[in-house]
Amino acid sequence: MAHAQELTPEALAGLRERYRRERERRVRPDGTRQYLGADAEFGFYAADPWAGESDVREPVRDRVDVAVVGGGFGGVLAGARLRQQGVARVRVVEKGGDFGGTWYWNRYPGIHCDIEAHVYLPMLDETGYVPEWKYAPGEEIRRHAMRIAETFDLYTDVLFSTAVTSLSWDDTTGEWIVETDRHDAFRATYVITATGVLSELKLPGIPGIERFKGHTFHTSRWDYAYTGGGPDGGLTGLADKRVGVVGTGATGVQVIPKLAEDAGQLHVFQRTPSSVDVRANRRTTARDVGADRAGWASERRDNFLRVVSGEAVEEDLVADRWTATAGLLEKLLPSFRRPDDLAAFEAAYEVADAARMNDIRARVDDLVTDPATADRLKPWYRYACKRPTFSDLYLQAFNRDNVTLVDTADTHGIERMNERGVVVGDTEYPLDCLVFATGFSVGVSGVHSGRLPVRGRGGVRLRDAWSARGPRTLHGLTSNGFPNLIQLGGVQSASSVNHTHVLDEHAVHGAALVAAAEAKGAVVEPTREAEDAWIATLAEHAPDHAWFHAECTPGYYNAEGRGRPNGPTAYPHGAAAFHELLRRWREESMDELLAPRARVRAC
């Protein structure tokens, strides 16, 4: 393995050139347009395989205090934090058949979370639950979302198998009208949107995809009726099948070992290899994590956030590969900025990055027996160009006689499909089943994309209000002209690799806003001046990431090779500082976000 001190200027120059060549092999002129949505003729890919037949019910026409759009962790946390604030009439609307969000939909074989369960699963202190595994399987995570909902009585008023189709502010009554695909039209004083950033599955736009006569499905709607087995494997229905899988990101890294165990033949179609580090999962006990202490989970979660944000701590409580590479993770977070010599920092960072990636590539050689296959599995890009993955099974799966790796980089993916299978280059691969592990339209909620129309004061659409100059918010949560609308997990806030922590802080803040508005008979709405000040704060310290992502291999981090824009898109000082800012705001400045309910004009 190459270490930092062995990386000469010549070696670094060679790496840069290799990274450039590998990037050029994969960049497509159509960018993000290469993907299809699961609608129109492809709508069957998004059908709910878990809910069964929807209950027949009459349309809902009543009124609640708060409508929460989305029943994933964001929505569950919003409901729970509202309950803690004493809000009684809370209704969650969720298109799935139960709580869980992405963990409701994704139940594919091998699914786990890559963040330690004791920091990823929220409200462990409040529910008294201690995770069974360091990295929890999907079923444990989904059941915890349900546990929170049960603990805080969210099942009392919930509309499952129901999608919100529009949110409209009534200027006359000062309420939101919530309409759904089941003809509901109820009213709410407040709306909290928690539609998530992993909710819209995507498919590869392969020419002829509709011609294939075999079986197909997306990993987020796994078809166990066809494959047999369950999340732990045992896919006996594939024993005599020729199976293909498209996608080798976080989902593919988990599902491919399970498919390899049970499929008659498995073809893995890979455009870009993931970086695959050690997982080292294990069962855990309450004693392992100090769960006998009050507040243990919050302490551990805060400790993890500080470590991956590059802050100094007395002890790294989680002590895993995320925290070990904390210095590199600063590139993933908007906290990266140095007041001193930026050029010197970048040079040192490049050396550390190269050493880390050399170690990851060396691990491929250690675990994959065929040199040609090993070479195709090596990630030739910088560490933060793609979300890292972790597995102790994935690379070894390619040593099996029934597994074939098909490199599609030079053809920019699968070239076409026909009735029999897929075509790459001059080779046709006949298949009985093709699994799409192609992920989601990451980072774009239904509200921001316009798929969920939101109309505020005077009927102005949120998307139209933001079309000219981009998003306008205070803290990423509230917007002028859209009173009593609180958006969780949105732009212009802070991000973290542990997304549930961010969602929980948003939920705590949103619930506090609702409680304060109720106590004062006010509406939650920032002034335009408050928005301007917040955007100026973001812009003043906005990090220059555009050059970095423009040089990365294509993926969802950089809009498939287009780079990411600079500007006020996220809080620049990191999630830990942002959470502290929200706490101070609640203590000192809450009244600045409250306006008299009688106000009907934007100020």
From Swiss-Prot:
Required co-factor? FAD
List the GO molecular function terms: flavin adenine dinucleotide binding; N,N-dimethylaniline monooxygenase activity; NADP binding; oxidoreductase activity, acting on paired donors, with incorporation or reduction of molecular oxygen, NAD(P)H as one donor, and incorporation of one atom of oxygen
Q: Which residues bind FAD?
A: E94, T102, W103, Y104, W105, D114, Y120, V164
Task: Note the InterPro entries from the entry.
Answer: FAD-binding_Monooxygenases, FAD/NAD-bd_sf, Flavin_mOase-like
Residues binding NADP(+), per UniProt:
H112, C113, D114, T248, G249, A250, T251, G252, V253, Q254, R271, T272, K386, R387
Record keywords, A-Z: FAD, Flavoprotein, Monooxygenase, NADP, Oxidoreductase
SUPFAM superfamilies under this entry?
FAD/NAD(P)-binding domain
Q: Where is this site: Transition state stabilizer?
A: R387
Q: Write down the Pfam families for this protein, in alphabetical order.
A: FMO-like, NAD_binding_8
Q: So what EC number does this one have?
A: 1.14.13.-
Its family remark reads: Belongs to the FAD-binding monooxygenase family.
What task does this protein carry out? Catalyzes a Baeyer-Villiger oxidation reaction, i.e. the insertion of an oxygen atom into a carbon-carbon bond adjacent to a carbonyl, which converts ketones to esters or lactones using NADPH and/or NADH as an electron donor. Thus, can convert bicyclo[3.2.0]hept-2-en-6-one into the oxidative lactone products 2-oxabicyclo[3.3.0]oct-6-en-3-one and 3-oxabicyclo[3.3.0]oct-6-en-2-one. Is also able to catalyze the sulfoxidation of methyl phenyl sulfide (thioanisole).
Put simply, this protein is called Baeyer-Villiger monooxygenase
Species of origin reads Streptomyces coelicolor (strain ATCC BAA-471 / A3(2) / M145)
